[in-house]
Design a protein with these regions (language model features):
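Zinc-dependent deaminase catalytic domain
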Residues: 1-142
Length: 142
């Protein structure tokens, strides 16, 4: 399966999200982790929280209300299925749906990026306002 096909699956997943930000605007974000072509985990934004979210947000003086972002939820789910040393073989896909046909920028926030680095995920592919982008996390930054 090609990366764009995986990202399209995550776009469909994002549509299922009903997370609402404090501003009242819906933010539909989905994330999936793949190890090669093997699907490991998927998640959507949630009004729930998790101790890991509190940890990363407090280090970065981030949101006062630590909502569980799709990226973090996918990492938490994957950590129950694979050993942390295997995250170095994974790619994180993130999509933000704006409406039925459009996507928006889904680059992970600072708190999620800290988790991505800590778990050693080397590649992130996410939607942008005009398509998609890929980021590679260098070894010294993980």
């Amino acid at each position: 399966m090609k990366d764009i096909e995986k990202l399209n699956k995550v776009k469909d997943l994002a549509n299922e999200s009903s997370f609402v930000k404090i501003s009242g605007k819906p933010v539909k974000v989905g994330a999936s982790i793949y190890m090669g072509n093997k699907w490991i985990s998927s998640a959507v934004n949630s009004n729930k929280t998790n101790p890991k979210v509190v940890k990363y947000n407090s280090v970065l003086s981030f949101e006062k209300t630590p909502f569980l972002h799709a990226e973090m939820a996918a990492i938490i789910s994957a950590s129950k299925k694979i050993d942390i040393k295997n995250f170095k073989y994974c790619t994180l896909f993130v999509a933000r749906k704006l409406n039925m046909s459009g996507c928006g920028l889904a680059r992970p926030c600072k708190a999620c990026m800290e988790a991505i680095k800590e778990y050693g995920i080397p590649k992130i592919i996410y939607t942008t306002d005009s398509g998609y982008a890929a980021e590679f996390i260098r070894e010294e930054n993980r």
